[in-house]
């Protein structure tokens, strides 16, 4: 039986572009994902988030699903372009009205909103002025954060500024797999990275200035390595590989995201590749001076898998997985130890309260002849992962809550609607929601604080 702290938070997570739809309704402006998804060849089968799960119109159904699962927290993101259609300070009252209604309904239902301000949908108008290549975008984000904090004062206290800078920068400005689809060299990518970090620091100050009771968080994803044994040499080897920042794999590291915001400094040169180290050395002093001001109250960790590691003859090394190892429909390895060792490593490095802000898997779900969705693979996956999370907490990781990804099947970015991550099945032709077996299972987990696992 898994055991969790008495006040542990159980929730589910979504993101605006992935579920809302209503792409041109309510005064909303164009985001980079509106443009990118309509560009031929950029998404699976040319699919877009124009309608997605239609949560813009069907949010009451989503609220009922959260209630049915006994969840006390909902992590969702705000579409920046609903609030500021062109990314400036011409605020859109219709956008505020939509989120007012959602937030008020959540609070009335006893569900606390955990609001993410940026989950990848940059206003297209800002991208045309340089996007994350420009510090002006960081300043625009701070204005947006200030307005949100002012508007929702007394109602929203849990804020995450950014979701996964690794994906924002590496996939959007490096590989081009995500919006805006650029392929910049490392140096250009790092300029975007430092501007995202700068934006967080500026926004954190605005959120706290608006309401000292606000809690500010920052969500990271990246490489996790776990030791193949409890031997100190293997434990140390896994830690070295987790936090290393080589030039060929620097972005998908928690180090690059969390060192600047949690420790107030960039990663040390001895763990960085030479090009990355040179880019860090060239960061303007005023950005470095802002770093300590961005220290979060909580760290969000999006963790899905990990890599086994050991101390080899020539130093820390990865261990090859066995033939036929378990993997998800998205071909991600199934590695429950990630929720044990990942939080433990982050606790040792940063010493801050943590939330698992995303964890889950894509399955080849279908509606059976009985009209139900039987996703035994997801239940087994979540049970194994949550057992390991419990182990990590008992080993000293200060994890305060868990948000399953995701409440709904949704638009999975460049993969379109091919992948199904939800606890709830969505028929995209009709918008119908069908709770999967895992939704009922997870509801029992939340109701019993994990004792049913």
Predicted regions and their residues:
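A common structural microfeature
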Residues: 7-9, 56, 73
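Aromatic- and Gly/Pro-rich amphipathic surface segment
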Residues: 30-64
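Active-site region of glycoside hydrolase catalytic domains
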Residues: 1-43, 86-88, 96-371, 377-453
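Catalytic domains of carbohydrate-active enzymes, especially glycoside hydrolases
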Residues: 58-79, 293-299
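Glycine-rich, proline-tolerant flexible connector loops at the mouths of alpha/beta enzymes
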Residues: 78-91
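Generic alpha-helix structural propensity
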Residues: 54-61, 69, 78, 94-101, ...
């Amino acid at each position: 039986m898994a055991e969790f702290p008495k006040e542990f938070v159980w929730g589910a997570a979504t993101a605006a572009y992935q579920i809302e739809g209503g792409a041109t309704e309510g005064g909303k402006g164009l985001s980079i994902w509106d443009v990118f998804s309509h560009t031929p060849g950029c998404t699976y089968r040319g699919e877009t988030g124009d309608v997605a799960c239609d949560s813009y119109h069907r949010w009451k159904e989503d609220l009922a699903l959260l209630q049915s699962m006994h969840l006390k927290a909902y992590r969702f993101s705000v579409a920046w372009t609903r609030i500021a259609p062109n990314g400036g300070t011409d605020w859109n009252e219709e956008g505020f009205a939509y989120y007012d209604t959602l937030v008020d309904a959540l609070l009335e239902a006893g569900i606390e909103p955990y609001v993410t301000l940026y989950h990848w949908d940059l206003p297209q108008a800002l991208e045309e002025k340089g996007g994350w290549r420009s510090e002006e975008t960081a300043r625009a984000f701070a204005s947006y954060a200030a307005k949100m904090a002012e508007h929702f004062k007394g109602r929203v206290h849990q804020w995450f500024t950014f979701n996964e800078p690794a994906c924002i920068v590496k996939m959007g400005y490096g590989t081009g797999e995500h919006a805006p689809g650029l392929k910049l060299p490392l140096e250009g990518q790092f300029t975007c990275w430092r501007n995202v970090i700068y934006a967080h620091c500026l926004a954190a100050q605005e959120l706290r200035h608006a309401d000292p009771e606000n809690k500010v968080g920052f969500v990271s994803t990246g490489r996790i390595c776990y030791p193949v044994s409890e031997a100190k040499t293997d434990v140390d080897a896994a830690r070295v590989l987790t936090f290393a920042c080589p030039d060929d794999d620097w972005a998908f590291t928690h180090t690059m995201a969390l060192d600047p915001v949690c420790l107030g400094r960039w990663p040390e040169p001895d763990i960085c590749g030479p090009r990355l180290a040179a880019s860090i050395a060239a960061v303007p002093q005023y950005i470095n001076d802002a770093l300590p001001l961005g220290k979060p109250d909580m760290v969000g960790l999006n963790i899905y898998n990990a890599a086994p590691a050991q101390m080899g003859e020539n130093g820390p090394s990865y261990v090859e997985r066995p033939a036929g190892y378990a993997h998800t429909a998205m071909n991600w390895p199934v590695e429950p130890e990630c929720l044990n060792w990942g939080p433990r490593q982050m606790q040792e490095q940063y010493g801050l309260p943590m939330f698992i802000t995303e964890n889950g898997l894509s399955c080849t779900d279908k509606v059976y002849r009985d009209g139900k969705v039987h996703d035994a693979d997801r239940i087994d996956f979540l049970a194994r992962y949550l057992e390991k999370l419990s182990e990590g907490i008992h080993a000293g990781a200060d994890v305060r809550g868990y948000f399953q990804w995701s409440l709904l099947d949704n638009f999975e970015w460049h993969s379109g609607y091919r992948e199904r991550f939800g606890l709830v099945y969505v028929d995209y032709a009709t918008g119908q929601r069908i709770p999967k077996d895992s939704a009922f299972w997870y509801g029992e987990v939340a109701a019993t604080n994990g004792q049913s696992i």
